[in-house]
Amino acid sequence: MDLENAQNRIIDFIRDETGRAGVKGVVVGISGGIDSALTATLAVKALGKDRVLGIHMPESSLTPAVDSEDAEALADWLGIEYRTIDISGIISAFMAAVPESESADRLTKGNLKARTRMSLLYFHANRLNRMVIGTGNKTEILLGYYTKYGDGGVDLEPIGGLYKTGVWELSSRLGIPESLITKKPSAGLWAGQTDEADLGISYVKVDEVLKMIEDGVEPEVILDKTGISADQLNSVTRRIERNEHKRKAPPVPELY
């Protein structure tokens, strides 16, 4: 991949889309991970630091302190306006108001947290006449590895054309701190959660697989070239198929 070309195209994309919408800037959720770090960095290059608001939304009992420290350090490095909003009280109030939430499984509860964060981002975007820019990468989008109307509820996905491995490469090129690049990716929706444990395969391998699937490579060849198991390949293809609805607008019946 031509990293310079990718960088320039993403910067132009942010400028063009925000200009077309006539907004004053963007709001981005900063988790302390590499995807949001790269997104915020590119937004600053596109619009300038004064038009980028970073919001960190930890859950006090769950979010590792290092994530909050890394999020704040990134905002300081970029020189952007930055706020921290603890979502614990909001989640607790929801749980108290909806008794059934106590017995909900951890995925349902995790999705609630992602949608709470989306609502906070849009509150500030609406208040300030800005757009919400997402931090999803191509790997996550193809797999449907995100919450519908949560972290998937955004106006723009600037790094949505970059595989996860491409996110690491472009981040390194831009001088984003190595500690963020090498940190284990996690959505932070429950204790001990990591992306690669959820997926059952490393990002390096899953990116190889996704590229081959897009190129129409036969399953037997994918298994031979990547060295992954048939179960891992089936898991990837099932995710793509099962989560197709996330990549489409809600269906509407044809009446005329």
UniProtKB/Swiss-Prot annotation:
It catalyses: deamido-NAD(+) + NH4(+) + ATP = AMP + diphosphate + NAD(+) + H(+). GO terms for cellular component: cytoplasm. Its EC number is 6.3.1.5. Deamido-NAD(+) binds at residues 115, 148, 155, 245-246. ATP binds at residues 29-36, 135, 164, 186. The keyword Disulfide bond does not apply. The keyword ATP-binding applies. It comes from the Archaea. It comes from Methanosarcina mazei (strain ATCC BAA-159 / DSM 3647 / Goe1 / Go1 / JCM 11833 / OCM 88) (Methanosarcina frisia). Homodimer. Belongs to the NAD synthetase family. Keywords: ATP-binding, Ligase, Magnesium, Metal-binding, NAD, Nucleotide-binding. Catalyzes the ATP-dependent amidation of deamido-NAD to form NAD. Uses ammonia as a nitrogen source. Mg(2+) binds at residues 35, 140. Pathway: Cofactor biosynthesis; NAD(+) biosynthesis; NAD(+) from deamido-NAD(+) (ammonia route): step 1/1. Disulfide bonds: none annotated. Pfam families: NAD_synthase. Coiled coil: none annotated. GO terms for biological process: NAD biosynthetic process. One of its GO terms (molecular function) is NAD+ synthase activity. This is NH(3)-dependent NAD(+) synthetase.
